[in-house]
């Protein structure tokens, strides 16, 4: 399995990479939505994208809208953000997110979300 981590925080990218690699994922990273789209359009397929909402250059909402419009419909997308507002959650799900995980979170919550996406066994 391959995962793309899109977050402007190096700390968060490293943290998510560790969690994913423990579960056998191969990971790539991007620091903003535009760089994330560039990675996706490079032709290497990903099974999962973990996307923050608040990033420079292109935010997570714009990235979600673009990647779904560009045909990345099979790839699972999990929003990983500090935004806890219901409007943000609904907006992200409407834009094409498959799951939503609020920071901070623990290992169990992360595993549960991956299982809900069918990417790991419960």
Per-region residue spans from a language model:
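C-terminal output helix
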Residues: 105-114
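Charged docking surfaces used in two-component/phosphorelay signaling
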Residues: 14-22
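Residues at the ends of beta-strands that form strand-to-helix hinge/output surfaces
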Residues: 77, 102-103
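Receiver (REC) domain active-site loop signature in two-component systems and cognate sites
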Residues: 55
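Acidic, metal-coordinating helix/loop segments flanking the phosphotransfer/catalytic sites
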Residues: 29-48
